[in-house]
Amino acid sequence: MLRDLGRRVAIAAILSGIILGGMSISLANMPHSPAGGTVKLNHP
């Protein structure tokens, strides 16, 4: 059971990282978004 749990956690972490990375990239590529907002999102 521990292996399955660890695998689920790893997959969830990877998926969340990909989603957050894609969101930050899309926000940075948006022409109408302020640069300060993306910097604040990347560096809280």
Curated annotation (Swiss-Prot):
Keywords assigned: Signal
Signal peptide span: 1-28
A Pfam family it matches: YkpC
Name of this protein: Uncharacterized protein YkpC
Organism: Bacillus subtilis (strain 168)
